[in-house]
Amino acid sequence: MNSLVIILIAVVVLGAGYLGYGRWLAKKWGVDPNAKTPAVANEDGKDYVPSSKLTVFAHQFSSIAGAGPVQGPIIAAMFGWVPVLLWLLVGGVFFGAVQDFGSLYASVKNGGKSIGLVIEKYIGKAGRRFFSLFCWLFTLLVIAAFTSMVSSTFNGFTAGADGAVTKNFNGAAAATVSMLFIVVAMVFGVVMKTCKNMKEWLKAIVAIVLIVAMFAVGMKCPWYLNGDQWNYVIMAYLFLASVLPMWLLMQPRDYMTTFMLIGMLVGAFVGVLVGHPDMNLNAFNGFTVVSSTGVKSYLFPTLFVTIACGAVSGFHSLVSSGTSSKTVKNEKDMLFVGYGAMILETLLGVISLIVVGAVAVGGKAPEGLTPFQIFSQGIAGFLEKFGLPNSVANVFMTMCVSALALTSLDSVARIGRMSFQELFMGDTTDTSKMPVWQKILTNKYFATVITLFFGYLLCKGGYSNVWPLFGSANQMLAALVLIGVAVFLKATNRKHAMLYPPMLIMLAVTFTAIVFNVIGNVQKFQAGTATFLVEGLQLIVAVFLIVLGIIVAITCIKKLVLMKKENAEKAEA
């Protein structure tokens, strides 16, 4: 199959999904462009900041478009390109975008509250606490997986088969650019806040010029640190991202990053159109696949939890309800921000599939390379067609894939901190009325340190060990969010039946996957090949996730059923 046909099919399906199904949802749910949003009603200059549609979209897209749409499809390609493409398109339009839009809508309609607090309002405090604990544990997995990926990418030193250590210019140069991004973003944030009336086109030009300048500096001044050192640097950055006002760091950084990511997408898209490489992957490799290391994987549920962010991701709901809902200036922007950002991410997932298909050998993805390396080298090959030197293209792509993970990391660090605070939040947010222990546990600095500490411990196991559990927990969170949004829609007399199919399917997929994960880790302990810091911690987290998932699912479904009975009784009366 020629990749040009695949990309055109994807664009048509995703475009039709946005214009057709997305607009239909907005109409059925009752998006009101005249309603006052939480960002306007509760503006505080910190979390609640009314922002333009493009600015909120930039934050949403750059936060959700993490490593998932690159990592997932490339790993899942072991089953063949057909099942991966089908799940990306079906999942993106009817599962992922619906969840992202729905959670953003529910949050905006409830004062910008997180999805956990929305659950408390319609289900009860116990449901909220269990959900918040689930979310917090999940954020630890995201921090662990993505920190490990970024530190591995930034690692300035590579050990060869003979033990000789050589410098990794691509990683070191990308690291310099990424660190410059943090400083420049803060300056840009101050400028945007000071010059509120700056035209959007002027802000865009300034952002693009700054990106080019930082890229040039990175090429000249690579920063060589090893992976462990980068772990510490990343944790320090995440601390700042968690506690600083949104307008000062996260919003301007996400805004600038989006131009870089869209540039990457456009370059890759045009590269596919010009080069239109053939898909060298097999179309379908069967329902059971055995890797070169002898590990057996089943199409169900492995495919669905591996692809993760490109099709549906619970993490997106935390971004939608945790940060984006507090910056939406007009309800009419929600379709573009919530549904639209997910559609664009799905397109990124399709491009990742095409990249691995183009570089595949003998019907399989190249062995010995990480998904990031496959993606970076594949896109760099596309960009070479435009005369861009391979070394420059490789650094640019390394920088882009690192930016994908970093923008998700800073959002999830903030969301993890907020989830931890919500766990111990009582009926009042007035600290003067709280006991000392509650003041400490709900303090944003303390909550951030605790969240990052446990995320760092899990990170030591490496992303390849954390990813399977992350994928399962991620999709389980999506299922729970869909149930929660359905409860909200039902309670407010809005159409909600469209959420039932994705909700039930994701519950079946994720509980199966996470049970498989527990069984696999137990077997490693029985074989004597497990360690506490890797399999042990994962096993503990997995068991907690299963228990919490069951409790939240039963609580929410019970509420849905009871509401139906209550409504029926009212109708009879």
PLM feature spans:
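Loop-to-transmembrane helix boundary motifs in multi-pass membrane proteins
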Residues: 125-140, 340-347, 393, 422-461
